[in-house]
Amino acid sequence: MNRLWKITAVEWKLINREFITLFFALIFPVLMLLLFGTIYGNRPSEIMGGYGTVDVSTPAYTNMIIAVTGLMSFPLTLAQYREKKILRRFMVTPVKPVEILLSQFFVNILMTVLGLVVLIALGKVVFDLHFYGNVLEAIVAFIVILLGIFSIGLFIGGLSKNMK
């Protein structure tokens, strides 16, 4: 277990070097929120069913973060490891390929959660974001969506021979 956390720490450092993942998981959703929040504000309107524009669009931005990490970052990293034969090199070490996959899974989940925290905190501070649902149901939905998207990403990464 200790080895898994060490691998995860190394993978975390590696994912923070990838500009595309950082941009689309952390910066782009925040820019979208700031852009459309500044244009439309968060006043309740009849068009939005009595909710504010930021209140309605933030769940879409959260799903965008999940999709970027699960369908872009996760499978591309797995394909890159296959292309560069990194997983094959780990076969001669005590590290198991499952530990590499789990560490990638944990790192991408951490990036997703970090992106969501930044997005929701900024939405609350800048636009007074409201949540009109049950927190437990939202967490369960988040986990189900996360597992579904990451399963698709693992499938794509497993089929890909290279990053192209």
Label for each model-derived stretch:
Residues 89-96:
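Short helix-to-coil transition segments within interhelical loops
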Residues 3, 7-84, 98, 104-116, ...:
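Transmembrane helix-boundary elements of multi-pass transport/secretion proteins
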Residues 89, 121-123:
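Residues within well-ordered alpha helices
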